[in-house]
UniProtKB/Swiss-Prot annotation:
This is Phospholipid-transporting ATPase accessory subunit CDC50. Changing C80A: Reduces interaction with DRS2. GO terms for cellular component: Cdc50p-Drs2p complex; cytosol; endoplasmic reticulum; Golgi apparatus; late endosome membrane; phospholipid-translocating ATPase complex; plasma membrane; trans-Golgi network. Residues 1-25 are annotated as: Disordered. InterPro entries: CDC50/LEM3_fam.
Length: 391
């Protein structure tokens, strides 16, 4: 029976007393931080709604006007290898073309498929620029149905490797799997992103047709400046590494000291490595920021290498100028106008309701007490007044 009443040892005492789970007596831990809790009333809500509508309306209109000034040409050449003629230029089906110019286009874009002695195919695009376009001119490729934002895909590279460090095979980031090694050699650069790099080749000259002069383009400074610092020249020996599987067409005999890619200066690679957030995206490949594009007829030659049929997507050639917020994008301006319209609509509804069906008790003047009411209140709460009398 004695064991039933045996007590355990008490917690050790300290100078501050026994151990306690009480939170520290601070404003944050005790939830005493200062806060602002505004009282929503017609006098405060209506001006706010009207203010937002007045601000968002001109912003939305400005964004739409800026977007409409952007001139662009988009040609989907995904089916050039199957639908284009190999003998003469033919009109491209209308569903593969989209353009916005200040002047009317008289001649429809055309395409033709060519093949050299090595079996390499090229898609030749001819198109008309109906009016002079002021600088700057940008050439993008557009990909659809490609989910670069997949978690495994986004993480599939080795940070130290792209910084130029000669990482050993066993030390490579596991996220590079299954593109880590082949034939007991390290894949450089490893990972799914590098392996799936877009490799259609655009000519760096818009060849003028008839009396139109050639228009030169460049692939310099097409990547973000911060990206150019992320990629460094590798310290690997060419004999210790192999290219990714999908690069074998470009490097059929593997790497040598002469053809080893320098990702520090290879800006097309840097552009591709910055993954897109949506399955439809544009990536810059060429540009000219020094000269305007004269009106006339031009030809762009594209060497076909990228197999979009593997993921059921499309690839397009995009020639465009830029506006205040980039390319031709009406969505942002429309969203601003929608918000402005909703604010104006709710403001009108609240105003009409306030006029025809006011809420009297919502007036703040009812929170003030005059002297007579204070005296009555003090009388009711006198010391000798019982609870029964108050009720």
């Amino acid at each position: 029976m004695v064991s039933l009443f045996k007590r355990g040892k008490a917690p050790p005492l300290t100078k501050e007393g026994p151990t306690s789970k009480k939170p520290p007596n601070t404003a944050f831990r005790q939830q005493r931080l200062k806060a602002w809790q505004p009282i929503l009333s017609p006098q405060s809500v209506l001006p706010l709604l009207i203010f937002v509508a007045c601000i968002f309306t001109p912003i939305g209109i400005g964004l739409i006007v800026s977007a409409t000034k952007v001139q662009d040409l988009t040609i989907d050449y995904s089916h050039c290898d199957t639908k284009a003629s190999t003998t003469a230029f033919e009109d491209i089906p209308k569903k593969y073309i989209k353009y916005h110019f200040k002047s009317k286009v008289e001649n429809k874009p055309q395409w033709r498929l060519t093949e050299n002695e090595n079996g390499e195919q090229s898609c030749e695009l001819q198109f008309e620029i109906p009016n002079d376009i002021k600088k700057s001119i940008f050439i993008y490729y557009k990909i659809t149905n490609f989910y670069q934002n997949h978690r495994r895909y986004v993480q599939s590279f080795d940070t130290k490797q792209i910084l130029g460090e000669p990482i050993k095979k066993d030390d490579l980031d596991t996220s590079c799997s299954p593109i880590r090694s082949r034939e007991d050699k390290i894949i450089y650069p490893c990972g799914l992103i590098a392996n799936s790099m877009f490799n259609d080749t655009f000519s760096q000259v818009l060849s003028g047709i008839d009396d139109t002069e050639d228009y030169n383009l460049t692939n310099k400074h097409i990547s973000w400046s911060i990206d150019r610092h992320r990629f460094k020249t590798t310290k690997y020996n060419a004999s210790d590494i192999v290219p990714p599987p999908n690069w074998m067409k470009k490097y059929p005999d593997g790497y040598t000291d002469e053809n080893l890619p320098d990702i520090h200066t290879w800006e097309e690679f840097q552009v591709w490595m910055r993954t897109a957030a949506f399955p439809k995206f544009y990536k810059l490949t060429l540009k000219n920021e020094s000269a305007s594009l004269p009106k006339g007829k031009y030809q762009m030659n594209i060497e076909l290498n990228y197999p979009i049929s593997l993921f059921g997507g499309t690839k397009s050639f995009v020639l465009t100028t830029n506006g205040a917020i980039g390319g031709r994008n009406m969505s942002l301006g429309v969203l601003y106008l929608i918000v402005a319209g909703l604010c104006a609509l709710f403001g009108i509804i609240f105003l009409v309701k306030l006029i025809f069906q006011p809420r009297a008790m919502g007036d703040h003047t009812y929170l003030n007490f005059d002297d007579e009411e204070n005296e009555d209140y003090e009388d009711v709460h006198a010391e000798n007044t019982t609870l029964r009398e108050i009720l």
